[in-house]
Each structure stands twice: as structure tokens, then as C-alpha cells.
A protein has these predicted regions:
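A basic, amphipathic helix-loop patch mediating RNA/tRNA/ribosome contacts
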Residues: 60-96
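Short, thiol/selenol-centered motifs that function as redox-active sites or metal-ligating centers
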Residues: 26, 86-89, 100, 178-181, ...
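A generic, well-ordered mixed alpha/beta core segment in the N-terminal half of proteins
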Residues: 86-139
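Ferredoxin-type iron-sulfur electron-transfer modules in oxidoreductases and energy-metabolism complexes
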Residues: 51-73, 116-274
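Short, contiguous acidic and Ser/Thr-rich linear segments
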Residues: 40-52
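Eukaryote-biased recognition of intrinsically disordered, low-complexity regulatory segments
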Residues: 21-43
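N-terminal mitochondrial targeting presequence
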Residues: 1-19
Length: 274
């Protein structure tokens, strides 16, 4: 009943009878390559309840004809898990960064007469490959910079894991949910062409492994990196990262804790205790 009421309200136009949208009008920013000119193409596909943006893109892929009747190459886009786990389908949808697989048309579309209007653009903080596909390599390169792994130099008996405080374990779990989708980098004003800041995702992973009983072996190396130009000082505390993170990762808390840890590390290093 609530859904019907919402549609009725959004469908009212100057006293006319309310109109339930029957189609989706997608405006897609297209670009054949990073050195090519970009342009907009508009497609219309039939609307079905509970459709997501990926479903609409699949409809276009099956019949790549624009609203004006022109047959074109199907727009390029990425998807894998379709359950908001891989991050491959991340794009700007009606001006907001999120995953296309969980973006329901009823939620993100703007009702306009008999159509839901949806605008799709690629992420702007990553090199463009084609249309809605970008190269997220720098996220994985940043993980290398913070040494986002547990160092293992041989084979060991499994045995019992080292006990860990339950609060730390729960915090580590929240940090481990990162899927390197790029939402936080896209929303962060400090991540730009003029800055070398590694971004919130890599910093969160640095803390994740610093809190690991074995990963802690590389804590000094990670803190040393984070005290440099690419690290903690690059954060401007805009807090956009936690607003857009699809996994609600406490990124600002991670940055704050590492800010404390790097300060203690530098003081100890200055006093020769490191």
C-alpha cells in the first residue's frame, strides 16, 4: 500500500490522473576510450517491478537501439557477483556512486510521466577504459604500498589461533568487508590528480592487518609509509567515505586510530625507541 501511495504522489502532474511508469529511460555517458570524445546516448526499455540497473543494461545489450531508433554498439559495463560483493559494477547513478546490481529502479529512478529516468556515468577518479568500465588497478597498487597482507615465510602447523579480544575481532571483521569497489575514493575530495593520497580503502586495510596477530609483524613498515605524503596527512576529514561505503566500514575510525598510531610511531622513532 505504501508503494502504491508513493507512486500516486510522484505521478501527480498539474491535477492530472497519476501515471505509473511503464518504461525506463537511461541516459548513458559513452566514450570509446580515454582519448576519445564522450557523448550521451538515451535508451528506453520496458519497466518491470524489482528491476535493477544491471537488468536494464542487459535489456539494452539485447537490443542496443537508442530512443531515436538508431542501432549502436551495446554500452560496455562490468558485473560479476550481482550481490554487492565484488564491486565490479560500481558507477555513478543519478549523480550518486554505488553498485548497479543493488540499485533498484524504483529507488534510484526519477519518475517523469510514464518513465523512470536514470543517468549512468563511469567513475571519474579512475582511468576510463570504455563507457562505464574503468581501471581500478591503482586500488590494488595502494594495497601493495600499505603491505595489505599477512607475511608468511614458510609452512607452519595450524594449531590453535591466538586468542583475540572480541571487540578487536569484531572491528577487524568490519574492516575486512572491503571489496575494493572504489566508492570511497570516488567520493573523497582529497583523491585527485594533484594528490598522491592513497585513499580511505588502503588505510582501512593497513589497520586491519596491523590488528592481526601475525600481520602485526609489518606494522612498523605500514606506519612508516602512512607518515609520508601518501598517507594519513592526505585526509581532509570530509567524511564522504563513510557516507558512500556500501559495507558501512568505519573508515573514519580507522583513519583516526592510525593517526594516533603514526604519531606514537614518529615520537618513538625520534627518541630512538624504534
Amino acid at each position: 500500500m505504501g508503494l502504491m501511495s508513493t507512486r500516486a504522489c510522484t505521478g501527480v502532474n498539474s491535477g492530472r490522473m497519476p501515471v505509473n511508469p511503464t518504461k525506463i529511460r537511461l541516459s548513458i555517458l559513452r566514450q570509446a576510450g580515454k582519448d576519445q570524445e564522450s557523448h550521451w546516448e538515451v535508451f528506453e526499455v520496458p519497466f518491470r517491478e524489482k528491476m535493477n540497473v544491471i537488468s536494464a543494461l542487459i535489456e539494452i545489450q539485447r537490443n542496443p537501439v537508442t530512443k531515436d531508433g538508431q542501432t549502436v554498439k551495446p554500452p560496455a559495463w562490468e558485473a560479476a557477483c550481482l550481490e554487492e560483493v565484488c564491486g565490479a559494477c560500481t558507477m555513478n547513478i543519478n549523480g550518486g556512486i554505488r553498485q548497479a546490481c543493488t540499485a533498484l529502479i524504483e529507488e534510484v529512478g526519477k519518475p517523469n510521466g510514464d518513465a523512470y529516468e536514470v543517468t549512468l556515468e563511469p567513475m571519474k577518479k579512475f582511468p576510463l577504459i570504455r563507457d562505464l568500465v574503468v581501471d581500478r588497478t591503482k586500488m590494488f597498487e595502494n594495497l601493495k604500498k600499505v603491505q595489505g597482507w599477512v607475511p608468511i615465510d614458510g609452512s607452519f602447523d595450524l594449531g590453535m589461533a591466538q586468542p583475540q579480544d572480541d571487540h578487536i575481532r569484531q572491528f577487524r571483521y568490519s574492516l575486512s568487508r572491503c571489496m575494493t569497489c572504489g566508492c570511497c575514493l570516488e567520493a573523497c575530495p582529497q583523491v585527485n590528480e594533484k594528490s598522491s593520497f592513497v585513499g580511505p580503502a588502503a588505510i582501512g586495510q593497513a589497520l586491519l592487518f596491523n590488528l592481526h596477530p601475525v600481520g602485526k609483524a609489518l606494522e612498523g613498515d605500514r606506519l612508516e609509509f602512512l607518515t609520508g605524503e601518501e598517507g594519513i596527512t592526505g585526509c581532509g576529514n570530509a567524511q564522504n567515505c563513510i557516507k558512500v561505503c556500501p559495507k558501512s566500514i568505519p573508515l573514519t575510525r580507522a583513519i583516526a586510530e592510525l593517526n594516533r598510531d603514526t604519531t606514537k610511531y614518529r615520537l618513538k622513532k625520534w627518541m630512538g625507541a624504534v
